[in-house]
């Protein structure tokens, strides 16, 4: 069993960008985490029906983006598992591997979606929730605490870096032939170009 504190940052990462990386680093330093697991989703339940780059490409881009940070580790735990990527299942699998001191990193928008997640009370027993607030994000904590009484004592709020970058915008820029350099690592830009993604 490992009591080392480990951050968990999941997402579609379609593509991963500097906003994701900055949030992971901000939380790692603020909470003195041993490392941060970057976990690309296989099939995200709340995004079923939306077109995504194939999982192997999203995983490869995440690995390229994280290659120069020894505290970031990219995991294929959700991509390797068939079916929807449910957070409570992923956290349980990590617990089963001996990782017991987990910090689930979310944006304020994802926190607002907690009522739509499966097994939210179970998630709160498996990990602390770290919310990185974004510019202008409003969090209705009283309403969430009413639904999930354990949330306030399991919640950590951190003000994150204000990088206004979105994967949706990057995909649109690529489709329009506009540059995405300086918004995602050069290795990711090169990978997108080499594989003709988002055209």
Curated annotation (Swiss-Prot):
Q: Where is the signal peptide?
A: none
EC number, UniProt record: 2.7.7.18
Alphabetized, the UniProt keywords read: ATP-binding, NAD, Nucleotide-binding, Nucleotidyltransferase, Pyridine nucleotide biosynthesis, Transferase
Q: Which GO terms describe its molecular function?
A: ATP binding; nicotinate-nucleotide adenylyltransferase activity
Q: Return the InterPro entries for the record.
A: Cyt_trans-like, NadD/NMNAT, Rossmann-like_a/b/a_fold
What is catalysed by this protein?
Answer: nicotinate beta-D-ribonucleotide + ATP + H(+) = deamido-NAD(+) + diphosphate
- Top-rank EC class of the record's enzyme: transferase
Quote any Pfam family the record assigns: CTP_transf_like
What the protein does comes down to:
Catalyzes the reversible adenylation of nicotinate mononucleotide (NaMN) to nicotinic acid adenine dinucleotide (NaAD).
Q: What family is reported?
A: Belongs to the NadD family.
Q: Which HAMAP family match?
A: NaMN_adenylyltr (MF_00244)
Can you name this protein? Probable nicotinate-nucleotide adenylyltransferase
Q: Please name the source species.
A: Roseiflexus sp. (strain RS-1)
């Amino acid at each position: 069993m490992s009591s080392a504190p480990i951050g968990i940052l999941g997402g579609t990462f379609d593509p991963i960008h500097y906003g994701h990386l900055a949030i992971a680093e901000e939380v790692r330093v603020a909470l003195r985490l041993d490392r941060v697991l970057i976990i690309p989703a296989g099939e995200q339940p709340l995004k079923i029906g939306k077109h995504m780059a194939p999982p192997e490409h999203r995983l490869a881009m995440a690995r390229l983006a994280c290659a120069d940070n020894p505290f970031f580790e990219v995991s294929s735990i959700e991509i390797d598992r068939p079916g929807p990527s449910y957070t409570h299942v992923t956290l349980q699998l990590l617990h089963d591997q001996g990782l017991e001191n987990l910090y689930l990193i979310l944006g304020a928008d994802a926190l607002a979606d907690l009522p739509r997640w499966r097994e939210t009370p179970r998630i709160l027993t498996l990990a602390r929730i770290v919310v990185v607030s974004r510019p202008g994000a409003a969090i209705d904590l009283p309403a969430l605490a009413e639904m999930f009484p354990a949330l306030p004592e399991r919640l950590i709020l951190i003000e994150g870096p204000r990088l206004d970058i979105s994967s949706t915008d990057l995909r649109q820029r690529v489709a329009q032939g506009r540059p995405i350099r300086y918004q995602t690592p050069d290795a990711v830009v090169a990978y997108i170009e080499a594989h003709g993604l988002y055209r």
